[in-house]
Design a protein with these regions (language model features):
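ATP-dependent adenylation/nucleotidyltransferase module used to activate substrates
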Residues: 1-121
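ATP/NTP-dependent adenylation/nucleotidyl-transfer catalytic domains that generate, transfer
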Residues: 126, 131-223
């Protein structure tokens, strides 16, 4: 529920045509509903979005298939070059959380190899790549890069409006909690600690409203 509409259209159109029916797995609460219920945004410390919206729904789905007697392999399309953590992942390993083997068939591939296989099968890429996105997923992720924030602001300003509305709604819940607990109120924001401003290079705990983050995304490196 937090992907760009073009991604859903891509799944239900070109990919379904080439691969056959695709099962869409959904959590009981989508991203915005989950944030409103918790009265807070996901963060690097409390990354509940991944667990509640991806991991748990997948676990329930796989468990249902396994209970029906199926032997499963969880194939994941990630590449080692995408991050330091992914560079340490093997092609095959057992995942206790999903109770099955995970297979990463393109873990050692280059970006060009991914492009080539799309061309070989006559499959256009996700349209977001053609708009300038360097990766496709949550729109945006709490870990979005500066360039990704700028892209969203330029190509999908309505998303920025949705984020601002969500920040206003979460602020109401956060203010109530602060008053109840006798704490100083700090306005929550989607992007927490977007940049470091301290001398030692550590993040200073600031939460910037989405408009300020967008403004920062348009600055030069180091801005």
């Amino acid at each position: 529920g937090w992907e760009h509409d073009l991604t859903y259209e891509y799944l239900r159109g070109p990919l379904t045509t080439l691969l056959g029916p695709i099962v869409e797995i959904c959590a009981p609460l989508l991203m915005e509903d989950l944030i409103r219920k918790k009265g807070m945004f996901p963060s690097r410390v409390r990354r509940f979005c991944t667990q509640e919206l991806k991991v748990k729904p997948m676990q329930r789905y796989l468990a249902g298939r396994q209970d029906a007697g199926e032997e499963l392999i969880n194939a994941v399309g990630i590449r080692a070059a995408e991050s330091d953590s992914r560079s340490k992942m093997p092609e095959w390993e057992w995942q206790d959380g999903f109770d099955c083997e995970v297979w990463r068939p393109i873990i050692s591939w280059s970006e060009q190899q991914v492009i080539d296989i799309h061309r070989r099968h006559g499959l256009a890429p996700n349209p977001l790549y053609l708009l300038g996105a360097t990766r496709v997923g949550c729109w945006p992720c709490i870990h979005a890069r500066k360039s990704e924030i700028r892209l969203i602001a330029d190509k999908d300003p309505a998303r920025i409006v949705r984020l601002r509305l969500l920040e206003d709604q979460v602020a109401v819940a956060a203010a109530a909690r602060a008053e109840r607990d006798g704490r100083e109120f700090t306005r929550p924001a989607w992007f927490q600690n977007p940049v470091s401003r301290s001398v030692d290079g550590k993040r200073d705990g600031l939460c910037w409203p989405i408009e300020k983050v967008v403004e920062w995304s348009r600055t030069v490196r180091g801005g």
